[in-house]
């Protein structure tokens, strides 16, 4: 009965969310894929939101001056490498690293990975020093001949720049695909040796799509999918952003108190929460599946999950600002959706993809974040 009540309660919340929050299309003039959204923190750009999308042979950049209420096209980053690009990442350098000043923007994308029969491929890095208005090619952190995907950036505990990515380059050693990283001590000018973060040399499993966030405690959290295990979403932690434990350990599957889990293209964000020094982690995946039979859950495409214990323990389902009820295994609907919490931890902006007719479009909306549970009070005598 308790579970039934909770299900009815969530259904009601979803209905209210759909009424109270009218989602808006970001730009109906062109298809958009693989969203990334960040809040800029430096100089005259502080407070602006920046979003990037894969748009054919270019990265499409948009800006919002009003915390995500409205968006305008800013520029395109042309990437000429045939046949096209995929799975781009967007990052603002939070402090000076080597010769790279704070506020530098990096945008990186996978190229050459969709050629028939495969061939030379790489992750190409572009840099902007003016808040995303103009971009120049910077360098190539990773190159190969089979497949390289999904660049993600961060700073480790030593303040070094790290690029995380998915790689198929070690198939001959048994890694069908793995998650790896490289470290730069000079702000991205040069890159160190490859380190495997998640991977098993069984010729089968395909971990991918890493997202990394630093927690207030100084620890780091990574979410990712593992195809070969249903493409389910997993989480693991690190003390320093570069030491992630035994790579063959799959980590902890992200499961809700409702008996569901995410599959495909997970992302994670951290938000402050009043009264909770840990803050809260917000995770979302493309599909919501039942734990018991892996069938689509009734709330598929309609929720994200919240965790207040640094990624351990239970996750709680919460209505998504942009519901995508027809989410399915496809590179458009609800694929790699973005959650960007407000600086005060009271709201969250979601940017999610949906089909508008036969065209993939980005939609956005802001909604309240869950408040911290109130501490229990002693009854008066």
Could you say what each language-model-derived stretch is?
Residues 6, 380-381:
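Basic polycationic patches enriched in arginine
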Residues 1-11:
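Bacterial N-terminal signal peptides that target proteins for export
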Residues 18-22:
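Sec/Tat signal peptide C-region and signal peptidase I cleavage site
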Residues 23-378:
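Asp-box/BNR beta-propeller blade signature and adjacent active/binding-site loops
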């Amino acid at each position: 009965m308790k579970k039934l009540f909770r299900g009815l309660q969530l259904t009601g919340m979803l209905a209210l969310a759909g009424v109270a929050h009218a989602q808006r299309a970001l730009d109906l003039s062109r298809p958009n894929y693989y969203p990334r959204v960040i809040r800029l923190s430096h100089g005259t750009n502080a407070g602006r939101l920046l979003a990037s999308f894969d748009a054919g042979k270019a990265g499409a950049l948009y800006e919002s001056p009003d915390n995500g209420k409205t968006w305008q096209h800013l520029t395109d980053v042309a990437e000429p490498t045939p046949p096209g690009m995929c799975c781009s990442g967007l990052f603002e350098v939070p402090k000076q690293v080597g010769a790279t000043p704070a506020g530098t923007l990096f945008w990186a994308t996978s190229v050459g990975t969709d050629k028939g029969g495969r061939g030379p491929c790489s992750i190409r890095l572009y840099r902007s020093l003016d808040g995303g208005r103009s971009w120049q090619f910077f360098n190539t952190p990773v190159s190969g001949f089979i497949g390289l995907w999904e660049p993600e950036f961060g700073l480790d505990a030593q303040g070094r720049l790290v690029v995380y990515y998915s790689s198929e380059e070690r198939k001959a050693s048994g890694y069908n695909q793995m998650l790896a990283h490289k470290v730069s001590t000079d702000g991205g000018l040069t890159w160190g040796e490859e380190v495997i973060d998640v991977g098993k040399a069984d010729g089968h499993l395909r971990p991918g799509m890493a997202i990394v966030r630093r927690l207030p405690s100084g620890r780091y959290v990574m979410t990712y999918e593992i195809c070969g295990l249903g493409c389910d979403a997993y989480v693991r932690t690190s003390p320093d952003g570069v030491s992630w434990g035994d790579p063959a350990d799959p980590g902890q599957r992200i499961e809700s108190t409702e008996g569901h889990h995410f599959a495909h293209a997970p992302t994670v964000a951290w938000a402050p929460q009043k009264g909770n020094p840990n803050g809260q982690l917000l995770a979302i995946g493309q599909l919501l599946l039942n734990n018991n039979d892996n069938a689509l859950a009734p709330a598929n495409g309609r929720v994200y999950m919240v965790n207040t214990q640094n990624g351990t323990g239970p996750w709680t389902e919460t209505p998504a600002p942009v519901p995508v009820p027809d989410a399915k295994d496809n590179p458009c609907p609800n694929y790699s959706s973005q959650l960007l919490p407000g600086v005060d931890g009271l709201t969250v902006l979601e940017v999610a993809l949906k089909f508008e007719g036969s065209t993939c479009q980005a939609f956005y909306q802001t909604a309240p974040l869950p408040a911290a549970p109130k501490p229990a009070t002693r009854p008066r005598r």
